[in-house]
Swiss-Prot record:
The keyword S-adenosyl-L-methionine does not apply. It comes from Cereibacter sphaeroides (strain ATCC 17023 / DSM 158 / JCM 6121 / CCUG 31486 / LMG 2827 / NBRC 12203 / NCIMB 8253 / ATH 2.4.1.). Its main location: membrane. GO terms for cellular component: plasma membrane. The lineage of its organism: Bacteria, Pseudomonadati, Pseudomonadota, Alphaproteobacteria, Rhodobacterales. This is Cytochrome c biogenesis ATP-binding export protein CcmA. Coiled coil: none annotated. It is a peripheral membrane protein. SMART domains: AAA. InterPro entries: AAA+_ATPase, ABC_transporter-like_ATP-bd, ABC_transporter-like_CS, ABC_transptr_haem_export_CcmA, P-loop_NTPase. Residues 3-209 form the ABC transporter domain. ATP binds at residues 35-42. NCBIfam families: ccmA (TIGR01189).
Amino acid sequence: MDLTVTNLACARGGVTVLERVSFRLSRGAALILRGPNGIGKTTLLRTVAGLQPAVAGEISMPPEAVAYAAHADGLKATLTVAENLAFWAAIYGTDRAARAIERMNLAALADRQAQNLSAGQKRRLGLARLLVTGRPLWVLDEPTVSLDAASVALFGDVVRTHLAEGGAALMATHIDLGLAEAEVLDLAPYRAETPAGTEPADDPFAGVTA
């Protein structure tokens, strides 16, 4: 299933920040959002993922087809790496936990509690959830935060495999994942006109990636 976004408008803090956004993302393709901080990259990603309503426009893909990864890893601290992935696999109704451990190079950490992982290891575990979901569209908001160069390269390989298997990826990232096939969408032309005195309120997502 392709993702088609048509005349989408998104709001942050009750104020529209993007409008008339339209694009199509096909199976096997990746699209990287670009724009200055505060333009609304995170807001757009959250809207496509179904985490907040659109102000206007249409999104063709239902939230049930989307796997979303942002800054919070969503780990259960007292569960081991393997138990966290088994928990997510049960939620999503898949049997992909073992594959996720292998693909994200977590085998040596499988029996370690999440609370005892380094920041980079926690990030790899959080991203491993994408593999567990079995969902075709990955929506990624700065997915490489806390990852070292080797882990960035590893995750780039994981994304390429996802695309080769017919998945798609929509992301905001300042790090090169080595996705030569990825297209770029500059959000500057879609910035909404903001009346004086109605600037969007600060939110926990805007400071780093929006």
